[in-house]
Amino acid sequence: MSLKLYKTSISIFLILLIDQITKYLAIKFLSPDGIVKLLPFLNLVYVENTGTAFGMFKFLGSGFFIIIALVVTGFLVYMYFKDTQNWFIYSLIIAGALGNIIDRLIYGYVIDFIDLHLKNLHWPAFNVADSAISIGIVLFVYKNLKK
C-alpha cells in the first residue's frame, strides 16, 4: 500500500470514528426536545434529519439519498486515484459521505446535533460528517481557484 493511500485510509477511518462516536453520544445523552447550551453561540441538540443538508428534500426518502451518496462517494474514490495529490481533501469528503450513509442505513435518517447560532439566528443543525464534507468542499474550491 502506498503512503498516500495509507494516510487516506487512516484519515477516513479516524473521521468516521469521531463522527460515529459523537452521533452515538448524541443519541445516548440528548433528548429530542432538549437543548444543551455550551457557549453563547453553540448548543447541542438532537435532530433526526430525513432530508439533505439543512433538512431539504425530505420527501425523496432515505433510499434516494443513500444511492446518491454512494454514487458521489464512488466518483470521489475515482477522483482520488486520478489525483492523489489532494488525498486529504478527498478523505474529508469521502469520510463525511460515508458517515451520513451509515446513519441512513442504520436509522433511516442522519443524526445532527451541533447548533451554531447568533442570538436567535440558528444555522441548521449539523454533525461531524457534514463539517468534514463542508471543509473538504471549501478546500477543493480554494485549491482549484488558485490554479
UniProtKB/Swiss-Prot annotation:
Protein name: Lipoprotein signal peptidase
InterPro entries per the UniProt record, alphabetical: Peptidase_A8 (IPR001872)
Signal peptide: none
Chief location of this protein within or outside the cell: membrane
Family: Belongs to the peptidase A8 family.
Species assigned in the record: Thermodesulfovibrio yellowstonii (strain ATCC 51303 / DSM 11347 / YP87)
Localisation per UniProt entry: Cell inner membrane
Membrane topology: Multi-pass membrane protein
Top-rank EC class of the record's enzyme: hydrolase
Bilayer-spanning residue ranges: 10-30, 34-54, 59-79, 87-107, 121-141
PANTHER family in UniProt: LIPOPROTEIN SIGNAL PEPTIDASE
